[in-house]
Structures are given as C-alpha cells and as structure tokens.
A protein has these predicted regions:
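Beta-strand-rich structural segments
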Residues: 254-258, 330, 647-653, 667-670, ...
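Beta-strand-rich binding/interaction modules
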Residues: 249-296, 665-685, 709-714, 774, ...
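Extended substrate-binding grooves/exosites of carbohydrate-active enzymes
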Residues: 108, 112-124, 173, 178, ...
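Accessory beta-strand-rich segments of carbohydrate-active enzymes
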Residues: 91-95, 100-102, 130, 135-239, ...
C-alpha cells in the first residue's frame, strides 16, 4: 500500500457494478502502477503503460499536482458529477488513522475497526473480567481535505461504535462527547471545517475502568464521512412498517424525518419508491411502486412525512427465504435531486402467544438460540465484516435460528447479516441499570442510549424483541423502585417503537411483580421456574433467555442444583416456551475463571468457530439433516473446563489415549436417527439402539479402550443415512495441511481468509497429542491478523506471529490489503517442512 498519501476524502459512494467510467474518481500515480480510488473508499492498483486520464462528460478539473519522494499525486474533482453533486455522499473513513496509547506514546498508522487492547500483553492486574487485557486512554487522529465546493453542504462523521467515553475534536476544538460504548452516533463537522485546507479529526477514548467482560478499547467499528444538502433525510431517519401483511398483499408505510439545517424554509418533493439492490426501480407484476408528497421543511428544523402504498403478492421475509426489499427516499427541490436515502427492510409478521409460543408469518417456530458477545478471538472486538458473515453462516448451518445480542446493541453489519442470512434477533440495550458498569450512565443516558439503539435498528426484520436489561439488581427489591424503573423504560420503548414487544432477562431470583412489567419474560437458567410461574400466571409469555449448554436446574428458582437433562428438552416439552438461548454460543474473551484462562471456555464453539464434541447434541436436536456423532468422555483430558455448571464432561472426538489396561471409556453418541450401530476396533457390532430411548437422545456406549478405529452408523427407515468414525493416531505428526476458507479475497483492505492448520500422522490420521509451535509470516499487500487455537489458557499475545497448536490444530487469520496481487502466507510448524499458501487478492 502506498504510504503518506493525501487522501481526498469527500467522494461519492456508488455501487461497483456500474461502469469504470462512472465510478472512476481519481488516479494516483506511483511510478508505473496506477492507484485507482473509488467512490466507496475502496481502491486498488493496476499497471498501465501510459498515463490514462479519463474526462467524465468533459467535466474534469485538476485541483493540484504535487511531487514527493518520487510520488506524483493527481487529484481530480468532477464538477457536476461528484464534487458539485447535491446528492448524499457516504464514504468509508476507516483508513489512514494515527493512534497512540497514553500521553507518552508515539503515533502509529492504524485502520479501523481498531481495538488496541487485543494487541497488548496479558497482565494479571487487569483482572479476569477483561481476559487480563488492560484498557487505558487512547488517542486517534486523521487528516483529510474538504474542497471549497462543499461550502453550503452539511458534513458529518458517523462512528458505529467507540469504547468508550469518546471526545471528538476537529482542528483542536472539542465538538462532541459520547459516553456509551455500544451505540452509533453522528457528529456534525460543518461549523468547524476549513474548506480547501487540511483538517485534523481527533478522538480521545477513555477506557480506564473495567466492565464485566472483555469490551475491547478504541474505535472498534466502522467510521463514515457523510456530505448532504442542507435539506436531507436525517441519519437513521426512516421508519418502515408493514401494518397489513398477507400472502396476497402488504401495506408499506414509511415515516421519513427530513432535516433542514439552513436559515430558510424549503419546499421539496418527497418520493419513495421500491428499488432493487442496485438502485433501479423495482416492478412487481409490471407495476412500479412509488408515491410523492410536496412539503415545506422549516428552517433549522425537521418534519416527519408519512407515506404508504400497497404491493401485491409480497415475498415474505422468513428464516428459510429472508427476502429483503429496498425503499429509496428521493428529495427534490425545483426538479433537482438533492438527496437519496435507501432503507432495506422485510415484509413479515411476528406474534407471541401465551399458549403456543412464537409465530413468524403465522408459522409456529421454536427459537433455537445462542447468546453472543461481540468479540471474535484474536480479532478482539475490531471485527471485520467478513468475520461476522462467516460466524453467522456457520451457526445457521448448525441449526441456530435466533441470536440474543448480549448485552448490548451489535454493529449495523452484524444485523445486516442476520437479515440476509435469516435469524431472529433480540436486540439488547444494556446489561445492568443502576449497578455495575452502566450505573454511572443510567440517569443521564438511558433515554438517549435506548433511542440510539431503536432508531438505528428498527428497520431490521430480524429483530423481534427489544430487551431493556439483564439480571438486574432492581428485580429483587421488595419496594416499587424496580417496578417503576422497568415501567419507565418499557413505556419509553413502546412509544418509540410499538411493533415489537419488550423483554427483561431475569436471574433466578426476582420479585413476581417485576417480572410482570414487560411483554415477554426472559428466564435465565430457570426452566423449572418458568414452569412454576406458568401455574400462577397462565397469561405470561416467556422464553429461556440464558440456558446451560449441558446441565439444567433440578429445582425451581435454584440454578445451582442441576441434572443431566439438557435444558432444550423443556423447550420441546412445553408449547408455551418460545425458545431458548444458550450461554454462550461461542467462547469469548473475559469472564474467565482465573489465571491463566483468558475467557469463557464452556461454549459449543471455540473462538476459531470449530465445533466442539459437546456440540453434537444440539446439531442433532436443531437440524433436520441426519446426524450421528461421537464424543469420548475422559477426565484426564487437559482443557479449560469453564465455569462450574456451564461445564460439560471433558470430551474429545478422538480415540487416542495412553491407557493399556482396557479402561472403559464412555462414548456419547447424540443422534436424530431411528437407530444407531457401533463397530468397535475388533470389528464387533453393538446395537442397533434407538436414541429416543436415551436421555437427551444420546446413546452412551461404555467401551474398553483398545487402539484402532471406532465407527457409528445412523439408520432411518432401515437404511444408512450417516456415519462417524474416530481412530487411534501415531504419537508424532509427520505432516500438516493448510485449508483456507477462501483462497480469493477482495483487495479492499478489509477482507479476511481463515486458514485451518491440522496435524496428521503418517497414516493421515489427525494427531491431537504432542502439539507443535506454529510460526507465520505474510508477504505481499496484506497482514497477519493473528493466530487462534481455541485454547483459552494461551500465554502468547493475541497478535503474536507464533502459537502452539491445541489438540493438533490452529487457525491463521490474514487480511487483504488494497493492492491487487498475491498474498503469500508462509507457515513453519516446529520440526516439519515450511509451507507456502497463496491467497489471491482481486
């Protein structure tokens, strides 16, 4: 990547599928390679033998030419096409930031999303809550230029998430302050800009105090620079609802908030129309759907414009077919387009029934849910979009259909993927109220923070519930303070967004009157409590907002006494239970049980998104595909067990043990098949046995350990439909494989490849013993993001270039740069030959 470029930041955001001539904004020439900068902020290098300057419609103006260290920079402004365009500009603002940690630190170049804590040394003083990673105070700055032609426009910066207590400065002047670390916010830059000159945007981030889990530190989500006409659709200013929905027709209603920051009123035309993903008018059965309204927007004010129309034969948003529509709002003044704002939405109905649970489009659905924190292993909380997409795709294939965002609003991109992949989502405002981390903010910020979440997220069809708190201290108070506080929040949400119910997630101890406040009750680890509550309150609607992954409570209102009966069994036994959300779906940093563990290790997926043996029960229970899996229980297995009742018995998907005494080992075999047969290492068959005859549909075969191969076969209707096998490996690995999830990436500076490394013996059997040190380096325009193994007790930093395998495997994460070419990933495994993996960046 070319360093020290004067970036010309205010450029239109157009789709890449338009022609090169339409998209082309500037050419930066560095020797022979030609650096192309696109409207959306992405760019790459092509090689040209001649300087090729394109004149768009004859409206090309050369602004300046500068020579520095053999670098010739030519920046173009297309008058009437981009520079003087009155339409909205939204440009990614992630690149070329400078960052320093603390007052005495030195600035270094970083790109967003950025989490400074994930790149620090572990410190026992930082504590288990944060995964022994410190916070501190960090400083960011970025230089950018706004052309003179943008005088009279409104220029703003949107931050999708900064953790936390962010103070925003422009050219040395404090212009904004945002406390909460999980909500997006917009800051107006217009009054403080220097047009035609360099501007410096600075951000001070104060993460001095601890939270209850790993939060990360810094500008850990995307940033966007926006330019609009003084009269424009307000940021997050559309509210799309579908008040009438059937298979034959649907009514689309949209309230659009239009702002006018000028000193005179403006008469405009507001048009809304359905468009496709590329902005072209969408016709259904040959009919174009659009509606127009003439309005006057008051000076220095806003106006809400409500418009609606009906469409025939709508495609409903569902888990199987998450169809999405696009509604474009066009503002015109004197016949000229001054703003375009597109909102993606879905047409669907939701209903919670006290007796039958949850319905989507009239179809009864059990929520097969997981609670998720937002960090992603070695990436920390600075999670590129591709990581979200990969994680959710894996969970979808596993059978998950619902996500609880615990305990904060997620990134906009996360919700976009939930919409497009097909998940039900509980969007959660915060954890505690006037206790814990949020206590310092509650009185001053709760209205703003709830509003920020709802106004930003209300058009996502995946969201079905607004959660206003988790395991609240107020729930146990015998006075009315807790009830009054809960009622205050509930009423605020209902007024702001009445189409979705409200929810509170309650710990096992709570006052009955507190549980009655919200539309839906979330029971944490309290399946039997819900069953008892049902007898007293048959009108109550509820779900299991947190459940253990293996055990369940043995007595009502007592989460610390438990049985082997999996909590999911209760969900299936009682129609009125809407679903369950396992804590947690994926291992995460923080909330560790003590040094050297760096986080939560009791989930069905590790931080690499590798499925643990314990996950087999849920795969069999949550998917229609035939499943039979083996998990061998052995208490000598060296693993981080996680916290007490969230643990499972230690299991491996392997048949390599040090025993020579024919020791009996339980082989757990969850299955959704009719019958299962086991074949031991001597070839002897056992069964068939029926999973339905066993607790949790899990057959337990008690087998004496003998080296060799164990096979299980699943049958449906008397025919084999699936099988699983485990083998004894040699003690020493002789080779390894590198398997990327994708070998071709976008050269956009953001895209990722996740490379799985697996050790094998001479017979091609995976080796999980005698782990080896792995060292990685990357050549080309890209970078190593980190190495993960799923081992929470790791000693090396998350950004280390070396890490031992764990149970014979690890994962390498690399990110593309912004120059087309080949990214070479060079891997050295201790005692084995070096390998080179090529990743193409296009």
């Amino acid at each position: 990547m070319v360093e020290n470029l004067h970036s010309f930041s205010v450029l239109p955001n157009l789709e890449r599928k338009t022609s090169l001539k339409e998209r082309f904004v500037g050419i930066l020439l560095v020797e022979l390679p030609i650096y192309l900068l696109y409207h959306d902020g992405t760019d790459y290098v092509v090689k040209l033998s001649l300087i090729d300057i394109w004149n768009l419609d004859g409206k090309l103006k050369i602004l300046f030419m500068q020579k520095r260290n053999l670098l010739v920079t030519i920046v173009f402004l297309f008058i009437g096409v981009c520079g003087m365009s009155a339409e909205r500009i939204r440009q990614n603002f992630d690149f070329d930031w400078q960052f320093r940690l603390g007052e005495q630190g030195t600035y270094k170049t970083v790109q967003l999303p950025h989490d400074w804590s994930i790149g620090l040394d572990f410190s026992e003083e930082a504590g288990p809550e944060s995964g022994y990673l410190p916070g501190g105070i960090g400083y960011y700055k970025k230089d950018f230029t706004v052309p003179l032609s943008y005088k009279g426009k409104r220029v703003s910066i949107v931050f999708d998430g900064i953790y936390h207590k962010a103070t925003i400065y422009l050219n040395g002047r404090e212009i904004d302050y945002h406390r909460y670390g999980y909500t997006s916010f917009e800051t107006d830059l217009t009054p403080y800009l220097k047009y035609g000159e360099n501007n410096t945007l600075s951000v001070r981030v104060d993460h001095s105090e601890k939270s209850r889990w790993y939060t990360g530190s810094g500008i850990y989500r995307h940033a966007w620079l926006q330019v609009t006409d003084p009269i424009h659709v307000k940021m997050w200013g559309t509210y799309v609802t579908t008040p009438q929905v059937s298979t034959s027709s649907a009514t689309i209603s949209c309230v659009t908030t239009v702002a006018n920051v000028s000193t005179s009123a403006g008469k405009i035309e507001v048009e809304q129309q359905l468009v496709d993903a590329h902005g072209n008018s969408l016709k259904i059965n040959g009919k174009r759907y659009a509606v127009r309204t003439d309005v006057v927007i008051p000076e220095n004010g806003t106006k809400d414009i409500e418009q609606s129309f009906s469409i025939s034969n709508p495609q409903l948003w569902s888990l199987e077919n998450p169809h999405l529509y696009h509604l474009e709002i066009v503002l015109k003044q004197r016949g000229k387009v001054i703003d375009r704002y597109t909102t993606r939405f879905g047409v669907r109905t939701i209903h919670f029934d006290k007796d039958k649970g949850f319905f989507l489009n009239g179809k009864n659905i059990k929520m097969k849910g997981m609670c998720l924190h937002q960090d992603a292993g070695c990436l920390g909380v600075a999670v590129p979009d591709r990581s979200y997409e990969r994680r959710l795709t894996i969970l979808k294939e596993f059978g998950v259909n619902a996500i609880r965002c615990s305990h904060n609003p997620p990134s906009p991109e996360f919700l976009d993927y939930c919409d497009s992949i097909g998940f039900l989502v509980i969007d959660e405002a915060f954890d505690k109220w006037k206790s814990g981390y949020y206590e310092q903010f509650f009185d001053d910020c709760w209205q703003q923070d709830i509003s920020d979440m709802i106004v930003r997220d209300r058009n996502h069809p995946s969201i079905i519930l607004w959660s206003i708190g988790n395991e609240l201290a107020e729930a146990t108070r015998k006075d009315n303070v807790g009830v009054e506080r809960a009622t205050m929040l509930r009423d605020f949400v209902r007024k702001l967004e009445p189409t979705r119910p409200t929810m509170l997630a309650l710990a096992p101890a709570y006052q009955d009157k507190f549980a009655a406040v919200t539309d839906v009750v979330g029971y944490n680890y309290s399946e039997l409590s819900y069953i008892e509550d049902r007898k007293k309150h048959p009108e109550r609607i509820g779900l299991i907002s947190e459940s253990y992954p293996y055990y369940s409570g043995l007595r009502p209102y007592e989460a610390r006494d438990y049985s082997d009966k999996n909590p999911w069994n209760y969900v299936m036994e009682y129609d009125y239970i809407c679903g369950s959300f396992m804590w947690a779906g994926i291992d995460y940093i923080g909330e560790s049980m003590g040094w050297p563990s760096k986080g939560w290790a009791a989930s069905p997926f590790d931080m690499c998104m590798d499925e643990k043996p314990r996950a087999a029960y849920f795969r069999a229970a949550w998917t229609d595909k035939p499943v039979v899996k083996m998990a061998v229980v052995d208490y000598s297995i060296d693993e981080d067990p996680g916290k007490d009742h969230w643990q499972t018995p230690p299991m491996v998907h392997d048949w390599t043990f040090p025993y020579t005494d024919s020791r009996v080992l339980p082989i757990h075999t969850p299955s959704n098949c009719d019958e299962v047969v086991l074949i031991d290492p001597r070839g002897k068959k056992y069964g068939p046995r029926k999973p339905k005859d066993y607790l949790n549909n899990t057959i337990v075969w008690n087998q004496p350990y003998r080296p060799g191969k164990v096979v299980v076969i699943g049958y449906k209707g008397g025919k084999e439909v699936c099988r699983d096998s485990i083998r004894t490996s040699k003690p020493v690995a002789t080779h390894y494989t590198l398997t990327p999830d994708r070998s071709t990436l976008k050269a956009d500076g953001q895209d990722l490849s996740f490379i799985s490394l697996q050790l094998f013996d001479e017979n091609g059997v995976p080796v999980r013993i005698n782990d080896r040190m792995v060292t990685v380096r990357v050549e080309g325009d890209g970078r190593l993001m980190g190495i993960d193994s799923g081992e929470m007790r790791r000693e090396l930093r998350f950004d280390s270039h070396s890490l031992p395998t764990y149970f014979g495997k690890c994962q390498i994460v690399v990110q593309a740069g912004r120059i087309k070419g080949t990214l070479k990933v060079i891997v050295q495994v201790e005692g084995l030959p070096e390998q080179v993996l090529n990743i193409e960046c296009l």
